[in-house]
């Protein structure tokens, strides 16, 4: 088993977990690429990415170009003479000159079973779409968006209660060992590159705050999935009014689907210790855990103790 000289490119904590796995292996990380430091916190002080922090703790040279399109940055990377480059949630586009620079090209860790979800938010979109299974794909990168040949796939189930947070944590457990398995066997033929069937792909579009607004003209089943998919960000929400006509926005963390009732979508059907039940175009959405402005998430019952007037039975929410 040959030890490889690796360039690692990544930015968030998810990427740092993969870097740590490589550092624990027989392979050598000769350089780390990560996004430039960004202002964070109340003081807006520049903060290093989790990947940069880990690299510096291990005395690994760190490169932080704003782009890899310039010839100078490409020449600098090529001069490292790496065997392979591993890319995990890096955040920069890799031009062909970079993809071709390492002897064995560039590998990417992708948070879904390709080609099902290509793009920025595969974990969230798999829950949003009601998928029952997902996983991690290790692929050889090409110039397309998540279109490269697949080397290794590891599967996991999506539970009916799964949030993006819990699924992210599952994949963060699976992915690093899958990556090491590929690196250990990259040159011995254990993993045969498999072409993707582009006709089976969907684009996992980034989430937006606008999309997180609960739309009662969608089915209760879809809205319940949205609530789980949009947790931890941007968190599903809706608005209601008090008796004086003041609007109040509420975030929703947990809900349950109940059988359909023939009422206009958005109608408040009941509001008690069992939840706040709202009619949708198909099914009833029972809101169980909510958060009002300036408060911590709480049960529907606790919210109703102080805010029952917000949820008059028969009122139709926008």
From Swiss-Prot:
EC number assigned by the record: 2.1.2.9
Q: What broad class of enzyme is this? A: transferase
Entry's Gene3D superfamilies?
Answer: Formyl transferase, C-terminal domain, Formyl transferase, N-terminal domain
Superkingdom per UniProt:
Bacteria
Q: Which InterPro entries match?
A: Fmt, Formyl_trans_C, Formyl_trans_C_sf, Formyl_transf_N, Formyl_transf_N_sf, Formyl_transferase-like_C_sf, GART_AS, Met-tRNA-FMT_C
State any single GO MF term.
methionyl-tRNA formyltransferase activity
GO process terms (BP): conversion of methionyl-tRNA to N-formyl-methionyl-tRNA
The keyword Protein biosynthesis is annotated on this UniProt entry: yes
Instruction: State one Pfam family annotation.
Output: Formyl_trans_N
- What is one GO cellular-component annotation here? cytosol
Residue numbers binding (6S)-5,6,7,8-tetrahydrofolate: 112-115
State whether keyword Transferase applies.
yes
Keywords of the record: Protein biosynthesis, Transferase
- Recorded catalytic activity of this chain's protein: L-methionyl-tRNA(fMet) + (6R)-10-formyltetrahydrofolate = N-formyl-L-methionyl-tRNA(fMet) + (6S)-5,6,7,8-tetrahydrofolate + H(+)
Known function: Attaches a formyl group to the free amino group of methionyl-tRNA(fMet). The formyl group appears to play a dual role in the initiator identity of N-formylmethionyl-tRNA by promoting its recognition by IF2 and preventing the misappropriation of this tRNA by the elongation apparatus.
- Annotated family: Belongs to the Fmt family.
Query: What is the recorded name of this protein?
Result: Methionyl-tRNA formyltransferase
Species this chain originates from: Haemophilus influenzae (strain ATCC 51907 / DSM 11121 / KW20 / Rd)
Upper taxonomic lineage: Bacteria, Pseudomonadati, Pseudomonadota, Gammaproteobacteria, Pasteurellales
* Gene name of the record: fmt
């Amino acid at each position: 088993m040959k030890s490889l000289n690796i360039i690692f490119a990544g930015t968030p904590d998810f990427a740092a977990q993969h870097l740590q796995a490589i550092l624990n292996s027989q392979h050598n990380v000769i350089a780390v690429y990560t996004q430039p430091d960004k202002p964070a916190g109340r003081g807006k002080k520049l903060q290093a990415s989790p990947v940069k922090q880990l690299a510096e703790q291990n005395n690994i040279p760190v490169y932080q170009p704003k782009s890899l399109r310039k010839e100078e940055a490409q020449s600098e990377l090529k001069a490292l003479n790496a065997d392979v480059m591993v890319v995990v949630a890096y955040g920069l586009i890799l031009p062909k000159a970079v993809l071709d620079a390492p002897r064995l090209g560039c590998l990417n860790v992708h948070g879904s079973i390709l080609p099902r979800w290509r793009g920025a938010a595969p974990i969230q979109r798999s829950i949003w779409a009601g998928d029952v299974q997902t996983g991690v794909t290790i692929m050889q990168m090409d110039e397309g968006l998540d279109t490269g040949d697949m080397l290794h796939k590891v599967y996991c189930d999506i539970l009916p209660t799964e949030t993006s947070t819990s699924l992210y944590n599952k994949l963060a457990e699976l992915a690093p060992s899958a990556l090491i398995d590929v690196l250990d066997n990259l040159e011995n033929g254990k993993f045969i590159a498999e072409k993707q069937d582009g006709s089976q792909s969907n684009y996992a579009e980034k989430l937006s705050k606008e999309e997180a607004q609960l739309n009662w003209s969608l089915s209760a089943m879809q809205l319940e999935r949205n609530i789980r998919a949009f947790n931890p960000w941007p968190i599903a929400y809706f608005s209601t009014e008090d008796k004086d006509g003041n609007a109040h926005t509420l975030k929703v963390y947990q809900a349950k689907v109940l059988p359909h009732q023939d009422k206009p979508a958005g109608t408040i059907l009941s509001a008690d210790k069992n939840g706040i039940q709202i009619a949708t175009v198909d099914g009833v959405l029972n809101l169980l855990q909510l958060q009002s402005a300036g408060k911590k998430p709480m049960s529907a019952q606790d919210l109703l103790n102080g805010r029952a007037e917000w949820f008059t039975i028969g009122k139709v929410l926008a």
